[in-house]
Amino acid sequence: FQEDKMGKNIFAIAVLAGLTFAGLPVQVLAQPVEVGIQDYKYNPPEIKVKVGTTVKWVNNEKRASHSILFTGPGGFESDRIFPGESWQRVFDKPGTYVYTCGPHPEMKGKIEVTE
């Protein structure tokens, strides 16, 4: 009889705990927004994302390596991204980020980051 009563108490506590946390928001980690690199192009070449978004560039070329070179104020260039590799960055400030490929400046991309 004691075990049965204890089991009911544990069940009641579990139900109450579930109801307590049921109304709380759950933060879901968003998947990165992916930009492919193939045929010496960024695909898509222009994207719009919210502050806090991670953008991931994936090199789908067979032989060529590329980089992501941000050309605006405080410009920055990623390490080389070899075929089959990727590089990512979190955009934590709103603005327009224009980039090219360091070794292939004809490759152009743009990211619009909004609140």
Positions of PLM-derived features:
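Sec-dependent signal peptide recognition
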Residues: 8-14
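Short, Lys/Arg-enriched N-terminal segments with co-localized hydrophobic residues
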Residues: 1-6
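Extracytoplasmic copper-binding redox domains, predominantly the cupredoxin/blue-copper superfamily
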Residues: 7, 18, 23-115
